[in-house]
Regions:
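Active-site-proximal alpha-helical
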Residues: 121-205
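Beta-strand-rich interaction surfaces with strong enrichment in secreted/lumenal proteins
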Residues: 280-284, 293-298, 352-358, 369-370
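Extracellular beta-strand-rich recognition modules
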Residues: 305-311, 371
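Exoplasmic/lumenal beta-rich domain surfaces
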Residues: 325-371
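Glycine-rich, acidic and aromatic/proline-enriched surface loops and short helix-turn segments
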Residues: 101-110, 152
Length: 371
């Protein structure tokens, strides 16, 4: 009931027309996974054959055995995901994971500070991007701390406004701020939050720029602040989008000029189109489908008909798929086409037929016979 009062309600009675929420303990939750909520279980089995068709938590019986605190921690975290899915199914991971971490804290069951410590020791972590490879631990820490600052600054009632917003990320926060007639913007709150983290790291308590009733783990050896020489010099550095770098310039008394140059915008992708200036980008959003459709009149075509194209993809292997489909009846029915680099393997149950998954390793050419 407490989490519902803060974040909102899950789908209830939901897909199974049952008010109850179910939990399944199994030894096959996945390597290193304590538990999870799968949005697939909110689908009808006729749409998603692997759906359990109920509001369900999958919990690892081996890793959680004899550890009731960890069970409560995992359930509180995953319940926020279940609630968020009911209101804004494709919310970005930074907000969704941050709110789930906050759910742990609010029920007094956040068991580890390793996430926050990892972030504060290197705060140049994006608050708008989520990694597809490498460690996500500091991202969990950053997202939790920002969510905690939001709750402290605007009150717990504001959290539900963000959850209910169909817009994602900072756009959703801005929309929620307008709804409550706040004069803040998400960017302003981000700037305040970066100041709060710095002041906390320096041992300075400053009212609004601080966390309420919470003390994050201090970074070791002041590692969040980088020292620079005050002598006349220039240097190059990089920063993640909505990441933070802190610099210390110990200078003698006098007048100094600091000039900062940077890029006002960045490309969406790190790779260039295979030719020309443009390529079609499929977007990168949770629980979402993006498509491109074009009509061709092949009624007078003679001989072999081939569809040729270049593509480059980076997908979560076995869970996210890219398909090529054809309809010969105006879109009433669709047939998935087999391609040279695709697969019909479906261990996860997410492959709808024949698709690409994993990493392509760069641009490559595909040619499909449509005859």
């Amino acid at each position: 009931p407490f989490e519902r009062s803060v974040f909102g309600s899950e789908l209830s009675p939901g897909i199974d027309h049952d008010l109850r929420i179910h939990a399944l303990f199994t030894k096959k939750a996945g390597a290193g996974i304590l538990g999870y909520f799968s949005s697939r279980d909110e689908d009808h089995p006729q749409v998603s054959p692997h759906s359990n068709a109920m509001e369900l938590f999958i919990l690892d019986s081996t890793m959680l055995a004899g550890n009731p605190d960890q069970i409560t921690n995992t359930l509180s975290h995953e319940f926020q995901h279940m609630i968020h899915y009911a209101h804004d199914a494709n919310e970005g991971s930074n907000i969704d994971e941050g709110f789930s971490g906050l759910a742990e804290y609010l029920i007094h069951n956040r068991l580890s500070e390793a996430y926050e410590r990892s972030f504060l020791e290197n705060p140049d972590i994006s608050l708008t991007l989520w990694p597809v490879s490498g460690s996500s631990i500091p991202y969990y820490g950053a997202s939790f701390l920002f969510s905690k600052y939001l709750a402290d600054r605007l009150g717990q009632d504001f959290l539900n406004k963000v959850v209910e917003q169909p817009r994602n990320g900072f756009e959703g926060i801005d929309a929620a701020l307008k709804e409550v007639k706040s004069t803040f913007t998400a960017d302003q709150l981000f700037a305040e939050w970066t100041a709060a983290n710095l002041l906390y790291g320096l041992g300075i308590s400053n009212g609004e720029f601080s966390y309420r009733d919470y003390e994050p783990p201090l970074p070791k050896n002041g590692s969040m602040i980088k020292s620079l020489s005050c002598k006349n010099q220039s240097f190059d550095s990089t920063a993640m989008q909505y990441g933070t770098d802190y610099y210390n310039l110990p200078c003698d008394a006098g007048t100094y000029e600091i000039e900062i140059t940077g890029q006002p915008t960045i490309p969406i992708l790190s790779m260039n189109p295979i030719q020309g200036q443009y390529a079609w980008w499929s977007n990168s959003v949770n629980n979402s489908d993006t498509w491109m459709q074009h009509n061709f009149d092949l009624s007078n075509a003679k001989g072999s008909i081939r569809f040729e194209f270049d593509l480059n993809y980076d997908l979560e292997e076995a869970y996210d798929f890219l398909y090529l489909s054809l309809s010969a009846d105006g879109g009433k029915t669709w047939q998935m086409l087999k391609t040279a680099h695709g697969t019909d393997l479906n261990e996860s149950g997410f492959n709808l037929g024949w698709g690409w998954t994993g990493k392509s390793g760069g641009w490559f050419h595909e040619s499909v016979n449509l005859s």
